[in-house]
Structures are given as structure tokens and as C-alpha cells.
């Protein structure tokens, strides 16, 4: 039986350039899954585009590090904004877990309002759901809602986190990322998964057209390089040749 490869494009809703890049990678490439930032400046645009792509599985990209939250979070925000200080707070044991749980629920409900259905799965911006204090909240929430979630098993093992009851892939990698994006890198990451015997594997990606919002990101031009690789006909052929079928978290 074919192995399942989920190429998930993160950051749907970040900007129109990001959205159009994800749509391009779906229509002409190997992306069949994405995750939406419901507090993103272009999330309504993303929702409208998704209705033209019934084959694109759309999950929720839980956001605790960028923009404004949907609910009051005085314990986490600074001047009303979310930010990357969340890791320092995690190390200090000062995370407002009640606020985070409430925000997770608000973002989920906002997703349903925008997209007209529940997300295929849950992951997060900057992998905040893998912070040890936050992981159980998200895992229990996903299991309760009956949706899948992204699990970085290396982080899970290093922090001895209890495995979620929510469906997930056997493998996951964020290694298709950085300044040296290429088809060779993509296939190296995929071959490493096959060598581990994983029958289902998620590859994180960030394909985009660069616009003013994307240019503000520390990870900018590589998003365009990712788009070139992910829409390459030779990549699609190489994936099929290795015995993989492309899909989304609905195929688990």
C-alpha cells in the first residue's frame, strides 16, 4: 500500500501573497494541506480562496506569537499584542494557561465561522503547541473535538510528553526550511522518513509570493524558493516513484 505524504503549507491567512502562493502550490504542485491563521490580516481572503479548492485540506494554525488575540489575554500580551516572549514565560513557569485554553477555543470557533467547517487538524505558529505546558491543552482539545494534530515526535520524546489521543502522522519534519531550499533537500527529508519505516509523514512548508507583509518576516525569500520546488513536475514524479500518495490529515 502507498505511504501517505502530507505536504502542509503553514501560514494561510498571513497575507494575500502567502495565500496565493499556497493556492499555486496546491493547483500546480504537491501541497494538499494547509493551516490557517484566524487572526491573520488576510484570513477572510484565504477562506474565500479555499472554497475554490475542495481538494485542499484546511486546518487551524494556532497563533500565540503574532498579532492580536481574539480573546482578552492580559497575562500573555504586551500592549495588546502577542509575541515571542512566550518561550521566556514558559521557562519561568508563568504562562497563563487558562487564557491560552480560552484563546484556543475562540480561534477554533472563529475558524468554523470563516471556513464553514471544522479544521482538518491543528498545529501552531512557531510550534507553540509543542511547549510542554501547552501541549496537553491542545492535545486534549483536539481529541475532544475529534480532529487530528501535528506532533513533533522528537520534541515529544525529549520532554516526555504524553502522546495525544488525537490522530496524527507517524512522522513529521520541519527540515524543509532555511536558506538552502531545493528539491534535493525535500527528497532527503522524505527518504529519511522512509528509512525510519514511517507509513504517514507530514512535511512542513511555507510557499508564498513575496508581498509587503511577507517581507517583514525573518523567513522571506525562501518562501518563494519553496514555491518553485513544490510546483516542480520532477518533484511530483519523484514522490510517486518512492511509493507515496499525496493527501491531507483527512486521509489518516
Swiss-Prot record:
It comes from the Bacteria. Disulfide bonds: none annotated. GO terms for cellular component: cytoplasm. Pfam families: YdjC. Pathway: Glycan degradation; chitin degradation. Signal peptide: none annotated. Its main location: cytoplasm. Keywords: Carbohydrate metabolism, Chitin degradation, Cytoplasm, Hydrolase, Magnesium, Metal-binding, Polysaccharide degradation. Its EC number is 3.5.1.105. GO terms for biological process: chitin catabolic process; diacetylchitobiose catabolic process; polysaccharide catabolic process. It is found in: Cytoplasm. Mg(2+) binds at residues 61, 125. The keyword Metal-binding applies. PANTHER family: CARBOHYDRATE DEACETYLASE, YDJC DEACETYLASE FAMILY MEMBER. Involved in the degradation of chitin. ChbG is essential for growth on the acetylated chitooligosaccharides chitobiose and chitotriose but is dispensable for growth on cellobiose and chitosan dimer, the deacetylated form of chitobiose. Deacetylation of chitobiose-6-P and chitotriose-6-P is necessary for both the activation of the chb promoter by the regulatory protein ChbR and the hydrolysis of phosphorylated beta-glucosides by the phospho-beta-glucosidase ChbF. HAMAP family: COD (MF_01246). Belongs to the YdjC deacetylase family. ChbG subfamily. This is Chitooligosaccharide deacetylase. It comes from Enterobacter sp. (strain 638).
Amino acid at each position: 500500500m502507498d505511504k501517505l505524504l502530507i505536504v502542509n503549507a503553514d501560514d494561510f491567512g498571513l497575507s494575500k501573497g502567502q495565500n496565493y502562493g499556497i493556492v499555486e502550490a496546491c493547483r500546480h504542485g504537491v501541497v494538499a494541506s494547509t493551516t490557517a491563521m484566524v487572526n491573520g490580516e488576510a484570513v477572510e481572503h484565504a477562506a474565500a480562496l479555499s472554497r475554490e479548492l475542495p481538494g485542499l485540506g484546511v486546518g487551524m494554525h494556532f497563533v500565540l506569537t503574532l498579532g492580536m488575540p481574539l480573546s482578552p489575554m492580559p497575562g500573555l500580551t504586551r500592549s495588546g499584542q502577542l509575541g515571542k516572549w512566550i518561550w521566556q514565560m514558559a521557562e519561568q513557569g508563568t504562562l497563563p494557561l487558562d487564557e491560552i485554553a480560552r484563546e484556543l477555543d475562540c480561534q477554533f470557533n472563529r475558524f468554523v465561522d470563516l471556513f464553514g467547517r471544522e479544521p482538518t487538524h491543528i498545529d501552531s505558529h512557531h510550534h507553540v503547541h509543542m511547549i510542554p505546558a501547552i501541549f496537553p491543552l491542545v492535545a486534549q482539545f483536539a481529541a475532544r473535538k475529534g480532529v487530528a494534530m501535528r506532533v513533533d515526535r522528537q520534541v515529544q520524546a525529549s520532554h516526555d510528553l504524553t502522546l495525544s489521543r488525537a490522530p496524527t502522522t507517524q512522522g513529521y519534519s520541519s527540515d524543509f526550511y532555511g536558506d538552502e531550499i531545493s528539491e534535493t533537500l525535500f527528497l532527503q527529508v522524505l527518504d529519511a522518513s522512509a528509512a525510519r519505516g514511517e507509513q504517514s509523514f507530514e512535511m512542513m512548508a511555507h510557499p508564498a509570493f513575496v508581498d509587503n507583509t511577507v517581507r517583514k518576516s525573518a523567513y522571506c525569500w525562501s518562501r518563494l524558493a519553496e514555491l518553485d520546488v513544490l510546483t516542480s513536475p520532477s518533484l511530483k514524479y519523484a514522490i510517486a516513484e518512492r511509493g507515496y500518495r499525496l493527501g491531507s490529515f483527512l486521509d489518516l
